[in-house]
Amino acid sequence: MKIHNIIKIIIVVCLEGFALTSFAGFGDSCASLPTTTDGYLESDTAYGYIIRSIDMKAPGGNCDANKPGITFCFKNKDGSSDPCTMYTLNQGDSKKISDLSKDNNPDLGANPILKNIVLTVQTWQNDICLLMPTSRGPMPVACKALSNPPAPPSVPSCSNIGQSCYTGANYSQSLINFSGLAVQCLKETLDKIFFVGNSCGSQSQSSEITNLTAFPTFQGYLKNAIGAALILYVMFFAFNMVLNKEYGNPDKIALFVIKLLFVTYFSIGLGPLNFNSSQPTQENGMLKYGLPLLTGIAPEFAQIIFNAAGSKGLCVFDTSKYQSGYQFYALWDSIDCRIGYYLGLDLLYNIDKNGVLSSFARGDGGNSSGSIPIPNLGNPDKNSPNALTSVGSLRFFTVMFGFFMAGNVIILISGLVFAVIFLSILLYFITHYLVCMITIYVMTYVSPIFIPMMLFNRTKGYFDGWLKVSLSCALQPAVVAGFIALLITMYDSAIFKNCEFLRYDYEKNNVKFSTFELRLPASSAEVCQESFGYKMLNYYAGKGWEEHLVILFPIKSIAKDVVSILAELLCVLVFSVIFYYFSKSISQFAADLTNGPKMDAVTASPTKIVDLVKQGAAFIKDAAQATQGKPPSSGDMPGDGGSKRSEGQKGDDSFISSGGNSSGDSLSSSGGK
């Protein structure tokens, strides 16, 4: 009897052990899950813990790509009869951890930190996944492949939004690109709004669709009205010619015909023209010649200036590799490229530690012209921080933090001031160009009203004002571009000195981009090696870092070449301060030079961020002095500047309230006599 019981116990233990081993694969997913480069989410957060509490390959699981939904087994608390509970959720379903953990597992459903986390079933690339919110966005904790991956979202055609707003990045050759995308997106959108209209079919002409074509429809009616007015103008001229022989003069008739043809062609048009959306519309001379000319002047002039500026080979793209009609992207790519280059985007430097560039086919690039590559650039020191291994990170701020951890606060402040001023000025140029382009489109849209005004002496002033604003908005971005080109030239000279750059062109699946490798010149290479940009590149590559133990915690910092780095950075900072003050008047200078309106009120101020920082610093300083019982240093002291302003205001009020006793009133009354 005892032997029989022992055998039963052994059989039960074996069966339970087999069951446990069948459920022992927690963390198994039907499809592979994405991993982060530093492994932070998988090892140090609730995300990794939830992954290790889900099993998709347990008995009863479903990894069949043809079956809908996602089936998984959610872990129960230790000692339960079943290691986990099976669930099946369809796409779009959501469940809280507390709802999935029905046995109040103290490690999951009863955990106050985890119980309110919501898991949602959604498509993730080509898989259907159970997604969990994390600090880095929604991330999948379990996935299953789909037999029919979802088709990419189609670009809406029945819309006023330009197609380049969705696909514009494909025309760029810069790894970091947003300027060209913004310009082309706005241009195509303005084309649709003002002139072309949407591409909706006639069967969809509902009230909502009609509202989308309000501007082109109104201009069509406007052209009809202008055409009728021109007919009346011809009739009145004919009456005058019959009644007055002076109007029958051949010179006046010839001048009348020339002016009439000019006004007719540039206001209401003489024939159709296919615009960008391949939809034929009745175009006028302003759309065929005026608008392309006005919007093309600025990028053409700016591109000429930019090609003559900057370091040798840095961010100079091959315009022949752009698609037809998108060569203007070269200007904006050079701006975006410099933002990434100055701020340490590793791939732009042709640093490929993670093998990203190796997956692309490398074509012919620039000419090395005898320049020398930097030796051992791809071998980082063991003390370099993990943040330098992230693909696409802006390593400038990581390096600045390394200087800060070494106690070099001046370098940190100087670097941040340089970055803020540089980005602010470039943002000002981009917004200035966009505002001028919008103004040109508006001026073109109302051109049927103002162009006929040149026919009459009393209204010719309105035409002159319209023409002045149009030409000014076409030329102002070119003036500002000259200022930006000067800024970039000074920065390149101060940061990289005589360093040279070799372009590498990459291509894969119609995606083209270029990188620029910093190289030593064949002569005077030591000048380049002492430059701020060369030393920063070594820090980006993981060289020169040190590790120290501070209060039992290891920190990584930069303590080498501090004096030379500070000297070079202060030189860059001097140029930044000069351009900061010069940028305050660049808008007024451009407006005066082109005899047009000033755009400050509708563009991003190039000094706004720095001014806010200065005001914040002054406020903190005054607050610190107030806590120490000292009077504030600003002009708002009750007994100093504030009282002076009060006295001045009081004097002004007295002058105003003096009424007829004031000298101004006496002068007015005497003038009346």
Swiss-Prot record:
Topology in membrane: Multi-pass membrane protein
Keywords recorded for this protein, A-Z: Cell membrane, Membrane, Signal, Transmembrane, Transmembrane helix
Entries under Pfam families matching the protein: TrbL
Biased composition (Low complexity): 654-673
InterPro entries: Conjugal_tfr_TrbL/VirB6
Region described as Disordered: spans on this chain: 624-673
Annotated transmembrane regions: 224-244, 253-273, 410-430, 436-456, 469-489, 562-582
Lineage: superkingdom: Bacteria
GO biological process: protein secretion by the type IV secretion system
Basic and acidic residues bias spans: 642-653
Signal peptide: 1-24
Example of a GO cellular component annotation carried by this entry: plasma membrane
Protein localization: Cell membrane
Similarity field: Belongs to the TrbL/VirB6 family.
Protein name: Uncharacterized protein RBE_1264
